[in-house]
Amino acid sequence: MGKLAADQLTLSYDSTVIIDGVDLKIEEGKITALIGANGCGKSTILKSLARLMAPKSGTVLLEGKDIHRQPSKEVAKKLAILPQSPQAPEGLTVEELCYFGRHPHKKLLSKHTQEDHDMVEWALEATGMIELKDRTLDALSGGQRQRAWISMALAQGTDLLLLDEPTTYLDISHQIEVLELLKKLNRDHGRTVVMVLHDLNQAAQYADYLISVLDGKIYNAGTPEDVFTQPFFREVFGLECCIMRSPIDQKPMCLPTGLCPKLRAK
């Protein structure tokens, strides 16, 4: 059993079932990407793994125990979540934002400790934001802003980092900036990263494992080489693709060549 897992997880909004009886395990010390078509439920799974959504049935397990039976503060010491398009109060600086990550470790009305200061400084250094710590968030580029939010998540001091579409609304250079940072945090600092991604080639390039979702169930899971198959692209995305190897690192890549025939007929 991994540090974070789901057992027969069913998730719903009111009476509409979105995820139906899913089992999954997050590989510790690796980068995992949740992929699938729009509306398939991948972000819903991430919310449940982060304890932001209670299951209709089944269990999310954190360190082998039901995550919903653990105190919120204890969960926040083990797992950090960065939602899609997070918002902060106007005028907040990068450093002030980063200190919010220390809240799970503080008692009510207590002052910051030396450990808090050390963790914030480390998080800012690790994300390359130390020189920008006094800037307000609204004065940053898209990539810098996302790095600032990641520094806050790092300041929590957790081994698990969950991100919902961390590259959404960023141009390509800022997308790569964020993905390279997450790769560095995994490689150099041992963080387990779970993220929802839309770009399949980026998912294959940066993730060690992929979990694909189709109609509320896990379609397939494994390494990019295991997941990137012709049936996967046809059934999950309705695409005909040419699957090739990157000339740089031999990771699989897909080149869409058109819609599959059953979709053309519609």
Curated annotation (Swiss-Prot):
BP GO terms, sorted: iron ion transport
InterPro entries listed in its UniProt record: AAA+_ATPase, ABC_transporter-like_ATP-bd, ABC_transporter-like_CS, P-loop_NTPase, Siderophore_ABC-ATPase
GO function term, MF aspect, one: ATP hydrolysis activity
CDD domains (UniProt xref): ABC_Iron-Siderophores_B12_Hemin
Main location: membrane
Residue ranges annotated for the ABC transporter domain, each copy included: 4-240
Subcellular locations according to the entry: Cell membrane
Entry annotated with the keyword Cell cycle: no
One GO cellular component, as annotated: plasma membrane
Membrane topology, record value: Peripheral membrane protein
Binding, ATP: G36, A37, N38, G39, C40, G41, K42, S43
Enzyme Commission no: 7.3.2.-
Keywords assigned by UniProt, alphabetized: ATP-binding, Cell membrane, Ion transport, Iron, Iron transport, Membrane, Nucleotide-binding, Translocase, Transport
Keyword Transport: yes
SUPFAM superfamilies documented for this protein: P-loop containing nucleoside triphosphate hydrolases
Subunit structure: The complex is composed of one ATP-binding protein (YfmF), two transmembrane proteins (YfmD and YfmE) and a solute-binding protein (YfmC).
Role, per record: Part of the ABC transporter complex YfmCDEF involved in citrate-dependent Fe(3+) import. Responsible for energy coupling to the transport system.
Family: Belongs to the ABC transporter superfamily.
PANTHER family on file: IRON(3+)-HYDROXAMATE IMPORT ATP-BINDING PROTEIN FHUC
Name recorded for this polypeptide: Fe(3+)-citrate import ATP-binding protein YfmF
Lineage of source species: Bacteria, Bacillati, Bacillota, Bacilli, Bacillales
Designated gene of the protein: yfmF
